[in-house]
């Protein structure tokens, strides 16, 4: 054991990976629906490892923190700038005011309780579950004209206050928005009914949905032998597909075997005759039912031997950006292609007829390879799997953002700046937006983005925990149980105020009120709780714009809270 401790002291990088290993493991454990979460677990494990008196030198903490902030900005950049358009301004304005609540309430409570700068910053970070504030506030504290000892004391108390308030910040937010929120809107049944009403309005019904599919309802391809008298002396492919459409089934003829010859690319004017074998594609429940009408299903490996493709496509074409899904699916190039999924700022949004597709959205298409490829060219940029990250783009973005953040102005002799961390966030926002406009460069594959986001943040948190370890216990004794109660108030008051503001001032649809509030607070866990409570995915429609704004402003509040104190 002594040998292991010695090695961790000599090689502190191993202590960091020990912290990550144990922290991620504990963070995945759930007791019922409760989990500490990875970030809190990594912090607490880092504190325990820090009791071994391990010193982590060098800029490793800052390097990973900048990577994390750039990744955050990169993800939400397209949606952040889209919110500046007229139709996004109400949600953007709501999110900005909500974020002010999230700053002012912790600040007022910190003043009332007599907290110092570090305690106030930790209260903000934990109660609003915005871990990046730890680093941003720390950078700002280091620029203050105070003694090095005071700076160290403030920086060491931030993770203590964060850990005490984060648990209710996460679990409490889910409870306020998922349980209390519907009551504030007139009751759970009323909100459920409002969600169903919005779904119906947006096209979530059997008659309007045959062109769409959920992940649980995959596109399938089946072969049938034509036997129905309806075909008579022959029917064109377009006649058959129109017949399906009239019966609320969006099915397509993909291949035909006629007189023993396989026709691989079938034109709309191709004539189908009794005895032909046809391959139909579409939602599984519709395709399977055609055995009773067309004729018997046949097992023809040769006829069914063709590539089908699932392809994510970034929407960039002006001709489709801003259009409803129902409009896009009616376009000629969407023949044979279904939309399985839409992701916006990394969040899945409902695929409904009236859902508007924005530039920068990632739309997942399903169909035969040649039809999907043709549709992808008309929608935007095919985001094909790759293991290459454009590190020129990443490095340049962080460099430019960091240099901008390093610029400072002096007010009353106090230097004020975004800091390099705030600058990296701004750089990520701009470069993420730029990538959505010009997707031929700046590619960061989703797994790589996950690494930058999750490993970047948790590597930073691990070092913070290890550094704070020796003083953590004493700091916890000083803040005590009272900080937990103050944190609960700092979490709950802005959320309740946000719900009431969204309902009475902004007059959002009840289905969107809770999603907008969750987005402004960037609490994805609460969004899941809301959707589970109201039994609908529609709250996600209010989440993405407010999430982009909240993720930006709440991080910048790490600078502001220090200056206010």
UniProtKB/Swiss-Prot annotation:
It is a multi-pass membrane protein. InterPro entries: AAE_transporter (IPR050144), Asp_Ala_antiprt (IPR022457), RCK_C (IPR006037), RCK_C_sf (IPR036721), YidE_YbjL (IPR006512). Residues 296-381 form the RCK C-terminal domain. GO terms for biological process: potassium ion transport. Keywords: Cell membrane, Membrane, Transmembrane, Transmembrane helix, Transport. The keyword Disulfide bond does not apply. GO terms for molecular function: monoatomic cation transmembrane transporter activity. It is found in: Cell membrane. Disulfide bonds: none annotated. The chain crosses the membrane at residues 14-34, 36-56, 92-112, 117-137, 157-177, 391-411, 414-434, 448-468, 481-501, 508-530, 545-565. Its main location: membrane. One of its GO terms (cellular component) is plasma membrane. Belongs to the AAE transporter (TC 2.A.81) family. NCBIfam families: Asp_Ala_antiprt, YidE_YbjL_dupl. PANTHER family: K(+)_H(+) ANTIPORTER SUBUNIT KHTT, PTHR30445:SF9. This is Uncharacterized transporter BF1518. It comes from Bacteroides fragilis (strain YCH46).
């Amino acid at each position: 054991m002594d040998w292991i401790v010695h090695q961790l002291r000599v090689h502190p990088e191993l202590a960091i990976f020990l912290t990550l290993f144990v922290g991620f493991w504990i963070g995945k454990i759930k007791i019922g629906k409760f989990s500490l979460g990875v970030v809190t677990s990594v912090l607490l494990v880092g504190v325990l490892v820090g009791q071994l008196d391990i010193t982590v030198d060098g800029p490793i903490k800052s390097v990973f923190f900048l990577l994390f902030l750039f990744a955050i900005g990169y993800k939400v950049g397209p949606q952040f700038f889209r919110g500046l358009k007229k139709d996004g301004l109400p949600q953007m304005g709501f999110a900005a005011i909500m974020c002010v609540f999230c700053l002012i309430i912790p600040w007022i409570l910190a003043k009332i309780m007599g907290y110092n700068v570090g305690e106030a910053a930790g209260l903000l970070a934990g109660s609003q579950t915005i871990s990046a504030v730890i680093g941003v506030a720390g950078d700002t504290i280091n620029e203050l004209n105070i003694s090095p000892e005071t700076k160290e004391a403030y920086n060491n108390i931030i993770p203590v206050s964060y850990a005490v308030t984060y648990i209710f910040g996460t679990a409490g937010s889910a409870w306020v928005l998922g349980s209390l929120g519907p009551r504030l809107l007139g009751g759970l049944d009323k909100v459920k009914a409002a969600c169903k009403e919005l779904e119906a309005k947006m096209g979530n019904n059997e008659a309007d949905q045959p062109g769409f599919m959920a992940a649980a309802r995959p596109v399938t391809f089946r072969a049938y032998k034509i036997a129905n008298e309806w075909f008579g002396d022959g029917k064109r492919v377009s006649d058959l597909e129109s017949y399906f459409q009239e019966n609320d089934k969006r099915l397509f003829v993909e291949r035909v075997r006629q007189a023993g010859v396989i026709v691989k690319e079938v034109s709309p004017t191709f004539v189908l005759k009794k005895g032909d074998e046809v391959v139909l594609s579409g939602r599984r429940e519709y395709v399977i039912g055609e055995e009773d009408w067309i004729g018997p299903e046949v097992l023809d490996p040769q006829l069914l031997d063709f590539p089908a493709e699932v392809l994510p496509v970034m929407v960039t074409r002006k001709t489709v950006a801003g259009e409803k899904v129902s409009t896009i699916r009616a376009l000629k190039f969407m023949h044979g292609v279904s939309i399985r999924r839409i992701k916006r700022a990394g969040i899945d949004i409902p695929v409904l007829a009236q859902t508007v597709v924005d530039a920068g959205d990632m739309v997942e298409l399903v169909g035969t390879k040649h039809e999907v490829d043709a549709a992808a060219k008309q929608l935007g940029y095919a985001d094909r799997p790759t293991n290459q990250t454009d590190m020129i783009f990443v490095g340049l973005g962080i460099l430019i953002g960091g240099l901008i953040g390093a610029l400072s102005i002096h007010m009353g002799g106090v230097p004020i700046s975004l800091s390099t961390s705030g600058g990296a966030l701004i750089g990520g926002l701009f470069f993420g937006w730029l990538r959505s406009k010009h997707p031929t460069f700046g590619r960061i594959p989703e797994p790589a983005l996950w690494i930058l986001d999750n490993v970047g943040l948790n590597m930073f948190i691990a070092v913070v925990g290890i550094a704070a370890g020796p003083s953590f216990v004493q700091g916890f004794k000083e803040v005590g149980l009272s900080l937990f109660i103050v944190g609960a108030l700092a979490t709950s008051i802005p959320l309740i105020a946000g719900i009431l503001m969204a309902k009475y001032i902004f007059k959002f649809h009840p289905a969107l009120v809770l999603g907008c509030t969750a987005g402004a607070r960037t609490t994805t866990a609460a969004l899941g709780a809301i959707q589970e409570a109201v039994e609908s995915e529609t709250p996600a429609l209010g989440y993405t714009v407010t999430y982009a704004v909240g993720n930006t402003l709440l991080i910048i509040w790490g600078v502001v809270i220090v200056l206010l104190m």
